[in-house]
Amino acid sequence: GIPTVLFGIVTLYYLTDKPSDATWLTNEEREWLTNEMATEAAAIKGANEDYSIMKALTHPSVLFLGVAYFLVVCEGTYGINMWIPQMLKQWSNMSTTEIGFIGALPFLCALISVYIFGWSSQKHQESKWHLNVAVLMASISLVAAMFVESTFATMVCLCIGAAGIFACTPLFWTIPAQFLTGTAAATGIAVINSIGNLGGFFGPTAVGMVKDATGDFRYGLLLLGVSVFIGGIMCFYMNNRYQGKVNFEKAHEDASKLD
């Protein structure tokens, strides 16, 4: 809570709207970054139809990604976040203190996973298959939790599941950047995020309802695993649809000829 508010204040006054206004960059850095962004925006625009703000609000690809974000990231993230303490209470005889420490392990795994996937994606300049691997990690491990008995094995599944879901988040956002630029990108990303964040309500609610109906949280994890897998298929489709249409290398070559 408090760190987020403090960083929000810093961001408000420190981060600028565009690179050319960033006083903390050198003149050379500002010029390079401005040209780089203009070149990439031109490449995206040349490979896709022009999106206005209003069109971005209702475009099928934007709405489709909103549902994918709901299924892959938000429903799973919030569904796990909300219920981990109750899950551990049901599966073990741990004290409240022990539940607090053990319940933090999935998020520690998620922290490590986000760093590793981000580093690898950046190093190899590839995001589609990194996202696919993260989706499979999450969906398979959450479904596997249905078929194990011990608390230890279930927690291993939960840790791998959380690692996969959290790793999906930054990789997912490379998809809309493939066909949205400028103000349309800001609008489209806001729409995707708004639809996806409905998972903050539906994820925990669905897990709770399934637990009440079956008496076991493992069925709730099964639901989350299936949801992540379906959303992953949607992301795979969108990546295949747009990835490769944008030729950044050609755009940079064309831009260099103008220098």
Region annotations inferred by a language model:
Residues 113-126, 211-212:
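Helix-to-loop junctions at the C-terminal end of transmembrane segments
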Residues 125-175:
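C-terminal transmembrane helical hairpin of 12-TM major facilitator-type secondary transporters
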Residues 1-53, 237-255:
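Central mid-sequence intracellular linker of multi-pass
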Residues 54-118, 169, 173, 203-204:
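Extracytoplasmic gate region of multi-pass secondary transporters
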Residues 1-8, 135, 139-142, 157-158, ...:
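A generic transmembrane-helix signature of 12-TM secondary carrier transporters
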Residues 7, 11, 85, 117, ...:
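Small-residue (Gly/Pro/Ala) motifs that create kinks and tight helix-helix packing interfaces
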